[in-house]
């Protein structure tokens, strides 16, 4: 482990030296890619914090930028709402397909996503069902049409507007995936009081 840490420190120092002479430059917002994610949910998530992220997402899209959101597990029970926002029927069908595939993967491992949610922390925070949790989660995507569905390893090239990325909900995996997609910024909110219950 010590060697890995030392190598990481050396790599970071080398990168720091390489970029130290660079000057910041204005960049048009159309080149901006933002990832969005929410953490532990409670009864206020869909009423406050996720609404703010949704508002920001709409503004970025209006200005010509790209917004990518994921957490396919957080679509269960609300996938029909997201599907209606697809720019084509094919996009809507792809959303249903991704949710069904995720549920099938979980069931193959003995886990029923619809019966295991909401978590005890979500319930302590005032959520009563997986559908209620998902409705609060999808608010973070704003109101704009969904342009398409990206695979986990897909990179933003010339895509604009709002996109779904097929990702798990766990922080490490989704945040890594969003960064690899090309997101220069990832907005993530969580309800801290839930951590004691989960």
Task: Give residue spans per PLM region.
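Metallocofactor- and cofactor-centric catalytic cores in central/energy metabolism, strongly enriched
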Residues: 1-32, 42-51, 57-139, 143-147, ...
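Short, hydrophobic beta-strand segments
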Residues: 36-40
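Short acidic/histidine-rich active-site segments
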Residues: 188-190
């Amino acid at each position: 482990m010590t060697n890995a840490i030392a190598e990481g420190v050396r790599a970071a120092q080398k990168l720091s030296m390489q970029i130290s002479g660079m000057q910041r430059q204005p960049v048009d917002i159309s080149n901006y890619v933002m990832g969005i994610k929410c953490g532990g949910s409670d009864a206020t998530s869909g009423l406050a914090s996720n609404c703010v992220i949704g508002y920001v997402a709409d503004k970025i899209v209006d200005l010509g930028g790209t917004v990518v959101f994921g957490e396919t597990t957080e679509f269960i029970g609300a996938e029909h709402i997201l599907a209606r926002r697809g720019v084509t029927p094919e996009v809507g069908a792809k959303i249903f397909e991704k949710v069904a595939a995720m549920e099938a993967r979980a069931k193959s491992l003995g886990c029923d996503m619809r019966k295991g949610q909401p978590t005890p922390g979500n319930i302590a925070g005032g959520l009563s069902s997986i559908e209620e949790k998902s409705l609060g989660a999808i608010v973070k995507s704003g109101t704009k049409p969904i342009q398409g569905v990206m695979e986990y390893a897909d990179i933003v090239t010339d895509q604009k507007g709002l996109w779904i990325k097929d990702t798990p909900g766990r922080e490490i995996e989704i945040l890594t995936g969003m960064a690899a997609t090309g997101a220069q910024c990832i907005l993530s909110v969580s309800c801290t009081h839930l951590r004691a219950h989960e």
